[in-house]
Amino acid sequence: IKGTNGKSQGVVPFLKVVNDTAVAVNQGGKRKGAVCSYLETWHLDIEEFLELRKNTGDDRRRAHDMNTANWIPDLFMKRVFNDQEWTLFSPNNVPDLHEKHGKEFESAYLEYERLAIAGEIEVYKTVKASDLWRKMISMLFETGHPWITFKDSCNVRSPQQHAGTIHSSNLCTEITLNTNPEEIAVCNLGSVNLVNHISESGLDQEKLKKTITTAIRMLD
């Protein structure tokens, strides 16, 4: 792209490629591949991302098999409640927002908005936060996607804040682990058969406690 002066058309065409790749792979000829994509609410492509699972529109801009989710900062919800504007940015112009959460994110985001108003950032778009939120909810009712997940809540409650920022969850939104270009998060699943922990006197809680402790250690 760089050598031919070409430009990327945003995240949607690449998500379409990932979607088709996942469908092309299956498990034992029965279970098709699965993938989930999370996008932060400040991203310039968020409005098109919301429509990925729609059954109408240009099918080249759709990913019917991909699970999608919104990764929402608290600041966006504040803007919704206060009926304020929300600014969408290209990640090229705000490279550190992805790695920030909480007060750090809010401070950086407000500074980028100031730069946009001053003309120092050219690629951006301003929308009403309530309109964008309404579209999120509408798409959720219409297609079941994208899911609603909260970036700041996940990071504030993480026991691994020292290890970096949580950028997403998994396909079932049951884990929240930090990731970076060198570190991926893995969802290991396990189950405990409660029948094996029941005696004539009822549930053997000590045995169950020992089993769960061992299982968690094995999954770690």
Q: Where would I find each of the regions flagged by the language model?
A:
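Active-site cavity-forming subdomains of large catalytic enzyme subunits
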Residues: 1-209
